[in-house]
Amino acid sequence: MKVIFMKADLNLIKTLHPLEIKVIVNNEEEDDISASIIIEKLGFNEGQANKTIEWLNSKGIIEEIYRKLNVFYKATERGLGALRDGFVEEKIINLVSQKAVLASNLALELDIDVKEVRKAFGNLLKEGILSLDLDKQIIINCLDGTETNYQKVRVLLERAKNSDLLRESLTTEELLLISNFAKKKGADSVFFKIIEKLDLKFRLSSFGLEVKNFLMKSKLTGDELTKLTPEILKNKTYENKKFRAYNIHIPSAKTFIGRANSYLDYISKIKDKLVGLGFQEFDGPLVETEFFNNDALFMPQFHPSRDIKDVYYISDPSMQESLPEPYFSNVKLAHETGYATGSRGWRYSFSEDLSKRLVLRTHGTVLSAKQLINAKNPSRYFGVIRCFRYDQVDATHGVDFYQTEGIVIEDGVSIKTLLGLLEIFAKELAGATEIKYVPAYFPFTEPSIEIHVKHPVLGWFELGGSGIFRPEVTKPLGIDLPVIAWGIGIDRMALMHLGLNDLRDLFTYDIGDVILRRGKIDAKVRNL
């Protein structure tokens, strides 16, 4: 019978991959086709076998005849470690059989993680192998020779050490037991990992048989050359060989080129806006002394925000050798007596060692304090600064974040000037339509103001803090003019401006999600 193909079919046949051709011409109508069979029969590796089956199935050359999901239990490193080093249950029994042990001292005696010991000890109590007397001392009960659960798990691990355990090969009792020690995800913490493998079998379809006849008549074997290289030309290995046909009408693969990150682009636009308003940019190191991070800002050394629970301290080196004079002495006096400000200060004994400690900067105002030393009159400065705080991560908080920090040093600046700048941040840069100013307290500003904005999903939240620097901040650093200052969370501004509901979306690794919202975000950033 003469086989007649449509033009589209001929194009498909001519562009078959050599691996596909090998599978087609080496299988008969009744032959089963699967990845394992191809590997054994044709010498493909696993990747080649799976990919070839996927190609052939998508083209209708083979058709599925069998499908089954097999579940296996694979011994994890933790399980093999228990097999090698002993189960915690075994170690508990060995210890208790040698000496009297209180339940509360068990983890300490074994030098094993408390959670692991509690779990193993609980299992032994549940099985009745151990019990407690009135003094909470552990007692080993008489065993009747019955195999314990951990001994049964040991047997299963011994079997799984050589080959994965197929669920169907396990008894009902073994399945119930192994389910307590197995996970599909996060299996590092258990003895077995659950692995699912789909067993698929195919056969040549009617179309596939026609394709095979065409290939056989065309004397195509899958050994055809796929590319023309200098070596082939030089050695003339192309002689008596056929080349694989190429379909020039097939669209080329999509190229994903690098593009500007929308969030970094947003930060760049903020910088452009502030420079356009006459500000100069400043920057500084991530690691700062407590002196500039807190002391120079008139934050007392007993302030709760300086606690180790809120700050990342540097362990090596832990302290800076010296601090700049006369500013250190001036700040010390400001804390102890108020310096020349009319204030009485905080009235405590100021510690130089504490002031020298190194920390990851917790706020951008640290750079404003450093800038005051060299500031001109009048002047405007800003920075886009990465800050670090020990915080609980949620939709509006992160352990590291960007702030835009700034100061204006000028005769005549006032709260009115500050409110105008804050409105620019909230409305023009963050895109907020509803804002409010809330009285606040910061040790380094008086008066102090927080600006809050209303998010359509998250509701009201703080965008940042601001105020006029206290004389106890400015005078010890050589400034006798009023200074307005602010620290605004750029991450939160971006949350508003880019239409997101969670700070973590700014740093997502989900490329699909980024691509879906890129057009909308890029348009908003361009319109800043």
From Swiss-Prot:
<dbReference type="InterPro" id="IPR022917">
    <property type="entry name" value="Phe_tRNA_ligase_alpha_bac/arc"/>
</dbReference>
<keyword id="KW-0030">Aminoacyl-tRNA synthetase</keyword>
<keyword id="KW-0963">Cytoplasm</keyword>
<dbReference type="GO" id="GO:0000049">
    <property type="term" value="F:tRNA binding"/>
</dbReference>
<feature type="binding site">
    <location>
        <position position="469"/>
    </location>
    <ligand>
        <name>L-phenylalanine</name>
    </ligand>
</feature>
<dbReference type="InterPro" id="IPR045864">
    <property type="entry name" value="aa-tRNA-synth_II/BPL/LPL"/>
</dbReference>
<feature type="binding site">
    <location>
        <position position="446"/>
    </location>
    <ligand>
        <name>Mg(2+)</name>
    </ligand>
</feature>
<dbReference type="GO" id="GO:0005737">
    <property type="term" value="C:cytoplasm"/>
</dbReference>
<keyword id="KW-0648">Protein biosynthesis</keyword>
<dbReference type="InterPro" id="IPR006195">
    <property type="entry name" value="aa-tRNA-synth_II"/>
</dbReference>
<comment type="similarity">
    <text>Belongs to the class-II aminoacyl-tRNA synthetase family. Phe-tRNA synthetase alpha subunit type 2 subfamily.</text>
</comment>
<keyword id="KW-0479">Metal-binding</keyword>
<feature type="binding site">
    <location>
        <position position="444"/>
    </location>
    <ligand>
        <name>L-phenylalanine</name>
    </ligand>
</feature>
<protein>
    <recommendedName>
        <fullName>Phenylalanine--tRNA ligase alpha subunit</fullName>
        <ecNumber>6.1.1.20</ecNumber>
    </recommendedName>
</protein>
<feature type="binding site">
    <location>
        <position position="365"/>
    </location>
    <ligand>
        <name>L-phenylalanine</name>
    </ligand>
</feature>
<dbReference type="GO" id="GO:0006432">
    <property type="term" value="P:phenylalanyl-tRNA aminoacylation"/>
</dbReference>
<keyword id="KW-0436">Ligase</keyword>
<keyword id="KW-0547">Nucleotide-binding</keyword>
<dbReference type="GO" id="GO:0004826">
    <property type="term" value="F:phenylalanine-tRNA ligase activity"/>
</dbReference>
<keyword id="KW-0067">ATP-binding</keyword>
<keyword id="KW-0460">Magnesium</keyword>
<dbReference type="GO" id="GO:0005524">
    <property type="term" value="F:ATP binding"/>
</dbReference>
<dbReference type="GO" id="GO:0000287">
    <property type="term" value="F:magnesium ion binding"/>
</dbReference>
<dbReference type="Pfam" id="PF01409">
    <property type="entry name" value="tRNA-synt_2d"/>
</dbReference>
<dbReference type="InterPro" id="IPR004529">
    <property type="entry name" value="Phe-tRNA-synth_IIc_asu"/>
</dbReference>
<comment type="subunit">
    <text>Tetramer of two alpha and two beta subunits.</text>
</comment>
<dbReference type="InterPro" id="IPR002319">
    <property type="entry name" value="Phenylalanyl-tRNA_Synthase"/>
</dbReference>
